[in-house]
Amino acid sequence: MKIDIREAISSKLPKASRWIPGFVYRWLARLIRQDELNRVLCENRGKTGSAFAEGALHTLGVSVSVMGEENIPASGRFVFVSNHPLGGLDGIGLIAFLGKRYGDDHLRFLVNDVLMAVKPLDNVFLPINKYGSQSRESMRAVDAAYAGDFQIGTFPAGLCSREGRDGRVRDLEWKKSFVAKSVETHRDVIPVYFSGLNSRFFYKFAKFRKKLGIKFNIELILLPGEMVKNRGSKFEIRVGKPIPWTTFTSARRSGEWAEIVKDKVYDMADEQ
């Protein structure tokens, strides 16, 4: 597998791509750090799933320490829910951690369907359409995963964290589906906090896009480059105690429960 931004655009927009000047392709290649990403792919050729995730972290010189793994029960089916600070390395770090613990055959991670293009990880991915109607086939696959014996990993925000008006970097609203599914399939929820930040430029760009009234999150194109910018970094995963599925009663709406779990995850950042 090799990343080629010109080829990717040509396959998606064959007519429009003919009119895009060569310097634009070269600029985009530099923006997403195409050469450095291809180095990660090259050095981990032949690896898939958690083995690829571990290899990618090693190539980038990234270390991820885990605290609280003892909070995970020895048996059971769980939904691991995490904040989404980075939009790349956090997912890779969690796949490396959970894949090592459970094995790739017993892990499925809910992701934006565009990430299915990352072939070395598609064996643990469960695609969700974030920008269109969810196909019946995709919905059935998600339902089957929850009903089965897989451990499920998800970033309920769907998008990586943004900077708020108060200057704090936090996830946007958490989607309620993990609450409904945990109740439906009797799965306890395990809260996970992942440390880390993207660059100041990323957050400023996101704010500027919003000021312009552009709804589509065009800053997504910056995320591959953000991953490379974080090379050599040290991150931390904090695992909390399971939240029984019976906690999510009708006393509150599923959306309210989702925000309560989200607050719990951020509280874990300050726990010693």
Residue ranges of each PLM-predicted region?
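Membrane-anchoring hydrophobic helices of lipid-metabolizing enzymes
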Residues: 1-78, 89-93, 104, 122
